[in-house]
């Protein structure tokens, strides 16, 4: 047991972690250190310290890690081009290993023997938190109340919170599970659990619904240096400010909504609606620049790496040796990913409107349909003969066997 010991709780101020504080104190008789890791939740953090203390925590940490989140988690994943199942830009998945890292640091500082989290027994986050924590310190005990307590639903949690006098931002009428950070906002649960239900127009927090976006397109220029975005519309911005600026630009144009029925690591499908405005622009721009500067073989192989990278991040294997090895490969591919991309935004759509780079592999003189002096079209005949030689030999051999069969009357 942990009677009298310190337990660090990954505290968000939401429904799950709000009821965990009194539950842990009741069942473990332990001291609760609430740790809120700020990855860009915004207004959610305004009263979080007072709320945690009122709920029974003895101490509260609020760690601002937004810059680290962007530099060490978002940008590497962006450079890798990692997208899970074609839509999900990994906003929650990237944040969890960073949160786990900070929880371990706080546990070491406080001399805590255990870390608790509010992830459910049906979701991916329990895996991400626990695998990451044990990759950093395998001696730390982990408590996952959702897997052991008698509260079987969010309705039960609401009733428990009311019984304990804990203020919560959720009602039984609006019961979405929301994860919010600098990179995205995710919505799950409630009426979204039926894939046939269209998301309600008031669901979105940071994106204007496309049908309500401006009737005129807006252009945005994004400049990259070695795969990292550094300027927006010609203005150099620090990483966090850059994401915030692109969130505003894309959001007002209805850009960045992804509605996905995804395959969870634990074996079931789930439906999530994601708002990732800045991420949608950055991924689109980064890919257009790679089309211009990467050679064919590197680009094709990087597509394979991107998928594996996405799986590793989604599955909670951020601190794995394979992910580190893939980072080294990705870093090599980004040496020439420098240039400017112009995007046209219109009612939820992102359209490439121009790209340029000092490392461009595109040569207009070679591909022009007009007169040129660098490409002899007669050379194509020899190339075609060699390129198709294996098929030609196969056809000749089949014809020869057919003639032999006919000669012997087969």
Curated annotation (Swiss-Prot):
GO terms for biological process: argininosuccinate metabolic process; L-arginine biosynthetic process; urea cycle. Pathway: Amino-acid biosynthesis; L-arginine biosynthesis; L-arginine from L-ornithine and carbamoyl phosphate: step 2/3. Keywords: Amino-acid biosynthesis, Arginine biosynthesis, ATP-binding, Cytoplasm, Ligase, Nucleotide-binding. One of its GO terms (cellular component) is cytoplasm. ATP binds at residues 10-18, 118. It is found in: Cytoplasm. The keyword ATP-binding applies. L-citrulline binds at residues 88, 93, 124, 128, 177, 186, 262, 274. Pfam families: Arginosuc_syn_C, Arginosuc_synth. L-aspartate binds at residues 120, 124-125. GO terms for molecular function: argininosuccinate synthase activity; ATP binding. This is Argininosuccinate synthase. The gene is argG.
């Amino acid at each position: 047991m942990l009677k009298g010991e310190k337990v660090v709780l990954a505290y968000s101020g939401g429904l799950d972690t709000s009821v965990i504080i009194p539950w842990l104190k009741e069942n473990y008789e332990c001291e609760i250190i609430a740790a809120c890791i700020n990855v860009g939740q915004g207004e959610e953090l305004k009263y979080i310290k007072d709320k945690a203390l009122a709920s029974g925590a003895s101490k509260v940490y609020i760690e601002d890690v937004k810059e680290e989140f962007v530099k060490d988690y978002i940008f590497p994943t962006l450079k890798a081009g990692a997208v899970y199942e074609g839509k999900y830009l990994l906003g929650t998945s990237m944040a969890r290993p960073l949160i786990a890292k900070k929880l371990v640091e706080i546990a070491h500082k406080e001399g805590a023997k255990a870390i608790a989290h509010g992830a459910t027994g049906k979701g991916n986050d329990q895996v991400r938190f626990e695998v990451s924590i044990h990759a950093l310190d395998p001696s730390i005990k982990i408590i996952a109340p959702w897997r052991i307590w008698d509260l079987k639903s969010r309705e039960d949690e609401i009733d428990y919170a009311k019984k304990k006098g804990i203020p919560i931002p959720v009602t039984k009428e609006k019961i979405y599970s929301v994860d919010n950070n600098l990179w995205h906002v995710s919505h799950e649960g409630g009426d979204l659990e039926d894939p046939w239900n269209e998301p309600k127009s008031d669901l979105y927090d940071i994106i204007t619904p496309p049908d309500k976006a401006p009737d005129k397109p807006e252009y945005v220029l994004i400049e990259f240096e070695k795969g990292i975005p550094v300027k927006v519309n010609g203005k150099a911005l620090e990483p966090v400010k850059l994401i915030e600026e692109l969130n505003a630009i894309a959001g007002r144009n209805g850009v960045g909504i992804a509605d996905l029925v995804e395959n969870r690591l634990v074996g079931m499908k789930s439906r999530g609606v994601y708002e990732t405005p800045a991420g949608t622009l950055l991924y689109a721009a980064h890919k257009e620049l790679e089309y211009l500067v990467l050679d064919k073989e590197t680009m094709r192989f990087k597509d394979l790496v991107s998928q594996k990278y996405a799986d590793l991040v989604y599955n909670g294997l951020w601190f794995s040796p394979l992910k580190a090895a893939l980072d080294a490969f990705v870093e090599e591919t980004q040496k020439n990913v420098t240039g400017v991309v112009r995007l046209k935004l219109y009612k939820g759509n992102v359209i490439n409107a121009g790209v340029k780079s000092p490392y461009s592999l595109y040569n207009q003189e070679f591909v022009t349909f007009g007169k040129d002096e660098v490409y002899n079209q007669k050379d194509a005949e020899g190339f075609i003969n060699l390129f198709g030689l294996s098929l030609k030999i196969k056809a000749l051999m089949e014809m020869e066997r057919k003639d032999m069969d006919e000669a012997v009357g087969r």
